[in-house]
Amino acid sequence: MIKLGCTLLALTLTACTTVAPPQGSERGSGSVVSDRVKQLTRAVQWRPVATIPIQFNTHHPQGMVKIGDFFYVTAVEIRTPTKRFPQLQGGYDRDTGEGQGHVFKFDDKGKLVSDLLIGEGSVYHPGGIDYDGRYIWVPVAEYRPNSRAIIYRVDPSTMKAQEVFRFADHVGGIVHNTDDDTLHGVTWGSRRFYRWTMDSQGRVTNADVAPESLRKINHSHYIDYQDCKYLGRREMLCSGLNNYQSKKDGPRFALGGFEVVDLTTNLPIHQVPVEQWTESGLPMTYNPFWVEPTAGGLRAYFMPEDEKSTLYVYEADIR
């Protein structure tokens, strides 16, 4: 279910009525995507079908959803890079740096339509995002692990953000489980999972619980999730990557892939590499992605590059 007809109660709480997602919505295709992703193997060939130059500075892109003919991408504009401490200070390995979070809306030609500034102070790093048929869910965190985050929902029709809750850890990606009306987050490097419950009025009921009591360990290690989408049936699809070295001082090899994760167990139920790279060697799953069904397979959108980005479109046939 999704939220509509919301009445503002406080800065971070809302009372909402619930209705079913509209027929034919992007969320409604999730089960088809799930079934087809589970048929992907290393033998399935992804073929490039389009490259769309993005006509504005994308800074450092993070998450993406596609709604109709428009794309919504989160990005972090780094103004002062973080600096590592010689040793931990207050539990942190680096300072906060300075920056600005963005939610970009652009069309299928790569032209910027809207730029929503998002975040607050040192909380300027948006992460992976999800669309539930009504709202885009956006986590914004400090640019360092074990920090803090603000969770927003954005109305794509107005490009206005509403704060939902705050949490005492770095939340780098979020999905809305509309079957159970719960939110699920991943942390820095996706090493931890969180599950937040909501009451009948859409208010998060366990945001003030100590993170140590809520977190679950991610037992999948071959990639770090960068962006995730809810598929329905208590499953989410995540994309990500990891870097590997055959020698300590040798070159690094970046491998990306997809994982379908069971949100009841927090365990992957299907894993597959995506063996596609940019000319510079970045895996396509480096950061934002979106997947949708085609007549006989899947279409995937990737935007791995910073600043001067290209939207890469691939298709795969599922036999």
Label the model's feature ranges.
Residues 59-63, 121-128, 168-178, 220-229, ...:
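Repeated scaffold domains used in trafficking and secretory/extracellular systems
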